[in-house]
Amino acid sequence: MLLFFEVITMIFVGIDVAKDTHYAAVSDDSGAVLVKPFAFQNNAEGFCLLLKKLSEFDRSKLLIGLESTGIYSENLICFLYESGFRLAVINPIQTATLRKTAIRKTKTDKVDTMLIIKSLMVNSYRLYSQRDADFLKLRTLCRFRQNLKKSKARLKIQLAGYVNLVFPEFGKFFKSGIHIAASYALLKKYSSPKEIAALRTSTLCTLLSKASHGRFGKDTAEALKSLALSSVGVKNPYISIQIAQTIAQIELLEQQIKDLNSAIEEAMESINSVLMTVPGIGAVNAACILGEIGDIKRFSKPCKLLAYAGLDPTVRQSGQFTAKSTRMSTVSYTHLRAHETSAHLV
């Protein structure tokens, strides 16, 4: 009697990532489920449980797949990679497409683990590498910088509102607006028209001249004092406190962003990217784009990179009809869109 044993060449692990509880399942290359979907916590105990489940299999045959889900997946990705597992990070769009083709449009964490495994089987994948780990760290740094910039922009809007209440004429006094060094230096110390009008012309002249490196002098000081005397702003000392403290927050954020820029530029010194050769794109812009895209080599064709960045045109065609004008695709990442816009403006 002859016995035939099926040789398993690949073992797939699908992990559905969430904030507190992850789900994982294991299947062989024929689709047979070796380990049914199970939950494990996003902590040391949970990670040990995952390792215990995976220790039952030959590590050389294991391929782990999980979706790129932002901050919730980063620590698990780093843990698995540093533990020596082969790893593939999947675009969530791929699993979403597979879900649409299913007869039952069920979406649960357990079902998603099997969809991730199926995605590994039917779609091309690329193994996670040290270069990807470097780009992941870069992305974290750049996104933090982007958040600081958003906070600064929000504070600037608030500051303009406060100034418009107490000294509405001040907003148009400087051609460059209120968000300049001379304006900040003045408003931090004297944020009401009454205080500015009471200053000696020489004192105001010295303050403005020093903050503007000589750009504003006596004529500017006299004109500003005259404007302050006739201001129709509200007399509210508490808003003056808000103005001074808001400027302090803006200046702190500006210094933090400057420090982050230095850290990003230092990190880019070890990354050899063709983006650095593009005129007008500096180290920070290049780092932010690379942090979102990752290793450009993972895109086999330029059109795939364009699609990932949301720069591919949508196509409307039916029968012999083809639309003459179409919109750009809206499928892309918000963070990447922001950096694309920034690069276009350079």
Each language-model region and where it sits:
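A detector of single, family-specific signature residues
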Residues: 1-337, 342
